[in-house]
């Protein structure tokens, strides 16, 4: 999807589509801890553990946001009021529609709407918005911090590393105080800040990742191995005979941030040319409509899995379920297109231009490292 600046990066849409698929598959596989695929199952191949723990797709979205905004705003002066207005036009219409649909669903089910709308109101600060809307809250908190983060990273290229270290120390302090930190690490900016920051840093050092196939493969293997261990140790829900130590959530967001940020920089710089083969076109379309797919899929993904399991074939086998999830995800792309066309696109036409040429940048060029003023590759 094109940004309001008119720039379009198909490789990043592929990554966005992958992130949506991870989250979709996680919910398809695990409508409940018992199935259709039992949560205690651990894939034999470590790479598949990332699918089994597909909640990590949210972290991939966050790292991509940091990278993309660093890329779009590199060497430019940003007018932040139009920027914030554009982000509201991008995110709020569909979120409002989802809130209304969920309210209707709960009303028809006889549930208390007072509690629901109280949670919606709290969603400005806390992760209480429905259907994945909690991650929009996290993104909004990132946008509020973005002016400061970009200014700091332009003055000192490795400033994001200092902020990541501060986030780790904050999570460590919360763990020492409360004995657990998973809630803050997964559901709030306290954990996802690492991914945004790593994305920003990855853009500025992206040349180090270009064409480094063996490095990318080593990171993928290491990250898959870690998630295989994490999955075997009970994963997100702490199920199984052994449970991962609760302190793992102090560093898990950082591990996700490092792996995803490097992967994004590698893919963006190494495979920037538009690809026209069918699988890439499908992922590109999925990426273009990923926001709609992400917010809407929870209305039907569990029912899809149950219908297939009850009426077509048994999907308790992890690998069979993943194939069905892939087919259902592709079938969901037209739903994303309709949502995008009818709900998102009309408001996107109202977006404002929020960048001015670098010549108007109030920060002297000499104050910035050379890599920070280079144009996107």
Residue ranges and their predicted role:
Residues 1-11, 21, 25-52, 70-82, ...:
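Alpha-helical transmembrane segments in multi-pass integral membrane proteins
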Residues 40-53, 85, 91-141, 166-189, ...:
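Membrane-interface helix-loop-helix regions
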Residues 54-56, 60:
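Extended basic-aromatic, gly/pro-enriched interface segments that bind polyanionic ligands
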Residues 142-148:
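Hydrophobic, membrane-inserted alpha-helices
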Residues 16, 66, 88, 139, ...:
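Divalent metal-coordination and catalytic microenvironments
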Residues 87, 91, 95, 289-296:
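Loop-to-transmembrane-helix entry motif
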Residues 366-377:
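Long, low-complexity, intrinsically disordered cytosolic termini of multi-pass membrane proteins
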Residues 62-71:
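Central hydrophobic cores of alpha-helical transmembrane segments in multi-pass inner-membrane proteins
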């Amino acid at each position: 999807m094109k940004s309001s600046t008119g720039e379009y990066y198909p490789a990043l849409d592929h990554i966005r589509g992958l992130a949506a698929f991870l989250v979709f598959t996680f919910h398809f596989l695990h409508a409940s801890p018992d199935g259709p695929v039992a949560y205690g199952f651990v894939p034999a191949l470590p790479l598949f553990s990332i699918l089994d723990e597909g909640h990590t797709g949210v972290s991939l979205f966050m790292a991509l946001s940091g990278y993309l905004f660093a890329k779009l705003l590199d060497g430019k002066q940003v007018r932040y009021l139009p920027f914030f207005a554009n982000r509201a036009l991008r995110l709020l219409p569909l979120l409002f529609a989802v809130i209304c649909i969920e309210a209707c669903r709960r009303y028809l089910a006889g549930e208390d709407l007072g509690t629901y709308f109280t949670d919606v109101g709290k969603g400005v600060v806390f992760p209480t918005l429905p259907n994945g809307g909690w991650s929009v809250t996290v993104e909004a908190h990132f946008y509020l911090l973005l002016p400061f983060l970009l200014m700091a990273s332009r003055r000192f290229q490795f400033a994001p590393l200092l902020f990541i270290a501060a986030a780790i120390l904050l999570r460590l302090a919360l763990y020492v105080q409360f004995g657990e930190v998973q809630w803050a690490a997964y559901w709030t900016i306290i954990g996802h800040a690492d991914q945004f920051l790593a994305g920003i840093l990855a853009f500025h050092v992206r040349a180090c990742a270009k064409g480094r196939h063996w490095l990318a493969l080593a990171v993928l293997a290491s990250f898959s191995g870690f998630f295989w261990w994490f999955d075997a140790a009970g994963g997100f829900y702490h199920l199984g005979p052994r449970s991962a130590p609760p302190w793992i959530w102090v560093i898990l967001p950082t591990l996700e941030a490092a792996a995803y940020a490097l992967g994004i920089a590698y893919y963006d710089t190494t495979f920037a040319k538009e690809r026209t083969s069918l699988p890439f076109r499908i992922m590109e379309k999925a990426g273009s409509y990923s926001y709609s797919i992400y917010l809407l899929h929870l209305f039907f993904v569990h029912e899809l899995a149950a219908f297939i399991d009850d009426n077509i074939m048994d999907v308790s086998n992890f690998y069979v379920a993943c194939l069905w999830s892939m087919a259902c995800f592709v079938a969901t792309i037209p739903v994303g297109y309709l949502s995008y066309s009818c709900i998102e696109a009309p408001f996107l036409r109202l977006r404002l231009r929020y960048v001015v040429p670098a010549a108007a940048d109030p920060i002297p060029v000499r104050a910035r490292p050379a890599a920070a003023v280079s144009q996107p590759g």
